[in-house]
């Protein structure tokens, strides 16, 4: 375990080549604890995919939005080409976008005749008191947009562990919100009709119907895509970690949760590994390498049927096209430490 040299008796190739080669994949998620090199890995994987796919879209759902920093190029909520590539695009979206912004994006919505009385706002507040409904609708809106863009493969640079798997619960969240809104609409509908009728406003509480239609449309989108997420031919999840206790613990928890949702995961990227020379007198380097070796052995034992990719700790930050491309090469060509290690 002191090096990343491939042996002929290895059961699983220690690279992400199998992910790159799987042409049926449509959705690839890259996730892990904060600070483990998740964004670098997702950018580098997208670069490799761009070599073999017609069109690749890289999406950051991490509020920190590190894609712009990684490529040295500003990205926003609209997909744009990455400088130097003709088939790799990127976008950064806010998964916690305002629910009011989402509803305002509906077609043909004018001024809300209920807003002056606060009734519409009250019903929205009641419906959106369900935990996670803001995030669920934002994510659904992104998926709806992504589906219409027709990219061959989409790579998600996800938020740190803990937020990563929330999307799996979104269909249930939206169904709860829909049920609550429907109940409110049936209860208050007659009252709203009489109020609106006397004011000469829109008939039948139209803004509530629009809200229900909007949420139903998003729920259908997210339910459809979630079914694709559970198809191993279409979706896989790449875990990123470092060889330390907390990161390994988070990775194990994440893999168990992915498995419980029937989402394929068979690749782990272990970043920031030290390979000190045998003659090295750096006590800290040797001590840290010893610790990393212990956790690498645990990873090997726990995930013997996974592609475990070992990536070295680099002396410089991986930022910019050139450095990302070098890093990406190591995802498909196993890193071999210099002689004497």
Swiss-Prot record:
Ligand binding (ATP): 33-40, 244, 271
UniProt key word Magnesium: no
Residues annotated to bind Zn(2+): 282, 285
InterPro entries: Anion-transp_ATPase-like_dom (IPR025723), ATPase_ArsA/GET3 (IPR016300), ATPase_ArsA/GET3_euk (IPR027542), P-loop_NTPase (IPR027417)
An example Gene Ontology molecular-function term: metal ion binding
GO biological process: cellular response to oxidative stress; pheromone-dependent signal transduction involved in conjugation with cellular fusion; post-translational protein targeting to endoplasmic reticulum membrane; response to heat; response to metal ion; retrograde vesicle-mediated transport, Golgi to endoplasmic reticulum; tail-anchored membrane protein insertion into ER membrane
Subunit structure, as described in the record: Homodimer.
Protein name: ATPase get3
């Amino acid at each position: 375990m002191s090096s990343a040299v491939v042996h002929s008796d290895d059961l699983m190739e220690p690279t992400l080549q199998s992910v790159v080669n799987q042409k049926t994949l449509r959705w690839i998620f890259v996730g892990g604890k904060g600070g483990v090199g998740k964004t670098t890995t997702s950018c580098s994987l997208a670069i490799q995919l761009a070599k073999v796919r017609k069109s690749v879209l890289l999406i950051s759902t991490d509020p920190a939005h590190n894609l712009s920093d990684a490529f040295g190029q500003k990205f926003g909520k609209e997909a744009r080409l990455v400088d130097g590539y003709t088939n790799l695009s990127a976008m950064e979206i806010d998964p916690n976008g305002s629910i009011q912004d989402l509803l305002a994006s509906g077609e043909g919505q004018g001024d809300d005749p209920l807003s002056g009385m606060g009734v519409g706002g009250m019903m929205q507040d009641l419906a959106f008191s369900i935990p996670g409904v803001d995030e669920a609708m934002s994510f659904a809106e992104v998926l709806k947009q992504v589906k219409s863009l027709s990219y061959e493969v989409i790579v998600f640079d996800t938020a740190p562990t803990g937020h990563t798997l929330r999307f799996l619960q979104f269909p249930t969240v939206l169904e709860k919100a829909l049920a609550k809104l429907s109940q409110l609409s049936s209860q208050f509908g007659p009252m709203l009709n009489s109020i609106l009728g006397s004011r000469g406003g829109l008939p039948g509480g139209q803004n509530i119907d629009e809200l229900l239609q909007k949420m139903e449309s998003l729920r259908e989108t997210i339910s459809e895509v979630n079914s694709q997420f559970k198809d191993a031919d279409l979706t896989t999840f790449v875990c990123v970690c470092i060889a330390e206790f907390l990161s390994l613990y988070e990775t194990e928890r994440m893999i168990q949760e992915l498995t419980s949702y029937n989402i394929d995961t068979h690749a782990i990227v272990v970043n920031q590994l030290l390979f000190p020379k045998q003659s090295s007198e750096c006590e800290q380097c040797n001590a840290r390498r010893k610790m990393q070796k212990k956790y690498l052995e645990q990873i090997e034992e726990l995930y013997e049927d996974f592609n475990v990719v070992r990536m070295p700790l680099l002396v410089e930050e991986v930022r910019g096209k050139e450095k990302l491309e070098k890093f990406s090469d190591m995802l498909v060509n196993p890193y071999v430490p210099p002689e004497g290690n």
